[in-house]
Amino acid sequence: MSVVGIDLGFQSCYVAVARAGGIETIANEYSDRCTPACISFGPKNRSIGAAAKSQVISNAKNTVQGFKRFHGRAFSDPFVEAEKSNLAYDIVQLPTGLTGIKVTYMEEERNFTTEQVTAMLLSKLKETAESVLKKPVVDCVVSVPCFYTDAERRSVMDATQIAGLNCLRLMNETTAVALAYGIYKQDLPALEEKPRNVVFVDMGHSAYQVSVCAFNRGKLKVLATAFDTTLGGRKFDEVLVNHFCEEFGKKYKLDIKSKIRALLRLSQECEKLKKLMSANASDLPLSIECFMNDVDVSGTMNRGKFLEMCNDLLARVEPPLRSVLEQTKLKKEDIYAVEIVGGATRIPAVKEKISKFFGKELSTTLNADEAVTRGCALQCAILSPAFKVREFSITDVVPYPISLRWNSPAEEGSSDCEVFSKNHAAPFSKVLTFYRKEPFTLEAYYSSPQDLPYPDPAIAQFSVQKVTPQSDGSSSKVKVKVRVNVHGIFSVSSASLVEVHKSEENEEPMETDQNAKEEEKMQVDQEEPHVEEQQQQTPAENKAESEEMETSQAGSKDKKMDQPPQAKKAKVKTSTVDLPIENQLLWQIDREMLNLYIENEGKMIMQDKLEKERNDAKNAVEEYVYEMRDKLSGEYEKFVSEDDRNSFTLKLEDTENWLYEDGEDQPKQVYVDKLAELKNLGQPIKIRFQESEERPKLFEELGKQIQQYMKIISSFKNKEDQYDHLDAADMTKVEKSTNEAMEWMNNKLNLQNKQSLTMDPVVKSKEIEAKIKELTSTCSPIISKPKPKVEPPKEEQKNAEQNGPVDGQGDNPGPQAAEQGTDTAVPSDSDKKLPEMDID
């Protein structure tokens, strides 16, 4: 079973796998552990990753990058509107209202959803993992930013399904970093001790995330998160791009932003310049040849000037840091360490801002690029039954408060209740109780839209079906279970109706008003399968939840007044009936469409595979032409006649011309046939050359064998002690085989020496190998017979038996030795225990 963690980044992706030796970040086909989040669409296939990155400028309109933030977003979303101007490719509104990506693929215009494009990237990462692991990859853990909303998370989950992956968990990037940090720490405080608080700062290419985590031995608890969803490395790149656009506009009279290819080239150069400035404070040049209209451009920049230009961006570093401390009510002194990850944290000014805020040195014990994917792989190993990993519990948080709204018959309007507060533990379940006579709808939404980096606070609508009144016409008790799951996705996971069956019992005491109130009071039960500490509800929450009944508290008093005052207490039996729930999720892809996307992805993978095979077949022909042409005038020259060489060379030249003309775009089989045709002419020449190389070595080996056996025969005839135990008949057999082999070798050597090198050899290397094997199998068993052992005289054996070991210490130890043996250390069970985990 494979265990894979995927860091799905805005600019680049990483894949880590868990193996017996530990967690390993794997390299792609270019021997690079970083795979660009880039897809290029061509007339016959798709290029994904590094191959697509090289086409960003040459195939700008059909090369897609920076699509991560379009997940779960409508085309009319303000974020999408703002991004349009930065994109080289076109985005369109899909029939569902979501953002689609428009490209030309297979010679026709196609609109792909963000989920489909992400699935293409995931398929590539899956293929990379499979090529390293040499087995299928299905189970994985994928990272997402901690600020992703429900719609965005569901969108990424759909993308994993399209790619044929089973995502065990969508893991917040900061939580993955915290896991990678904490699981290997041996010095964490015990569970009963005060936890160690660590701040994790992750500034990547597109976003800035901060989290505070509390660590105890075997336990990680996220306390709070904060973020700036648009502050990242690309914002610093944009500052440089805008500066040079303005400078080159004045200096060279160029309107750079009017040409997307020029803008892309400038962006690439500015990113390189930014990285150089992180290591150098001196003036650095930026030069681009034939930039626009065949004009060469150049400029300079230094770190000091760059930081002045970035003052507005640097001012945005502190607020999230301050926010997490305020949310957790921690002081700066309570923070044990500040770990930084992400490419943009390498900018010296960013590091300085963070360090100055906390008043301490920053910790860089984690790999800034690979920490997220390593954390995801560790989480996958924890979830997988195939690996034994030390116990480590992870409690995440809900980033935004989630509320439910419903129509309240008693209040003749809508009621609402906050079910999960900001930074509530997750995954988490709660059971809400409603009193209803008919089906009802719950509307889930984020209750603080001002904190949401998303225009629509709605999450989903959940309709609880088949609710009926009790047999006496009263409202039924409906228990609804709401949950934030391991992916951070909210759902109404189940609903059940409590059926009450009553039978009058005269001897039972009368029901009091107090009993009725107690029955109605309990409205919210909390289930906590993944969280160790029970969270207490605040009075405000209790108040809100007590209003979930059909009537308010005042209404319940009125209701009791309508009942007969002398009603006898009934013997109550209850049973529960599961109720169906209809979900209306925001921007959710329906199952039928998802299956279509899965089918289309399979077709595109097959098309890519066929095109790769076709290209490989074409390249094989081209490679063979160049190889044979060089060798015909080189090492193969002596092994082909002049006429044959001339005709073959002409054939090779014709094939080369054909490849660049009529053979430019042919089916795979045409190239396979063409290569076979060339090999029919070239293979005999190649074989003659190989035979001339191998034959002398093998004849030499055969000669050595013959010489060795002749010496042994001579020694036997001279009656030397070493061979006097051998049988004369057997040695005659050896002599006969050796003489036959010598005669065969001399005969073949003479014939071969008379044969021209341009002709096929008289004897092939395989025949010589067979002769060596035949000679060895006949002679070796005979000459390697060991001499028979000579038994010593009986008297000597008797004396040897009488001479026992000194002091009686021999094979049978005496009582003293046995006593000593009892004191020797025996390995205890604890010493024999397996290590806690098999991942270093």
Swiss-Prot record:
Q: Where is this region: Disordered?
A: 500-575, 779-840
The protein's location, in the record's own words, is: Cytoplasm
Name the major location: cytoplasm
- Residues that the record marks as modified (Phosphotyrosine) are 89, 336, 660
Show the ranges annotated as biased composition (Basic and acidic residues): 514-533, 788-799, 829-840
Q: Which domain of life is it from?
A: Eukaryota
Q: Name the Gene3D superfamilies for this protein.
A: 1.20.1270.10, 3.30.30.30, 3.30.420.40, Actin, Chain A, domain 4, Substrate Binding Domain Of DNAk, Chain A, domain 1
**Which residues carry the post-translational modification Phosphoserine, per the record?**
76, 393, 415, 546, 647, 756
Q: Which residues carry this modification: N6-methyllysine?
A: 773
Q: How does it assemble?
A: Interacts with TJP1/ZO-1.
Kindly provide the name given to this protein in its UniProt entry. Heat shock 70 kDa protein 4
Gene encoding the protein: HSPA4
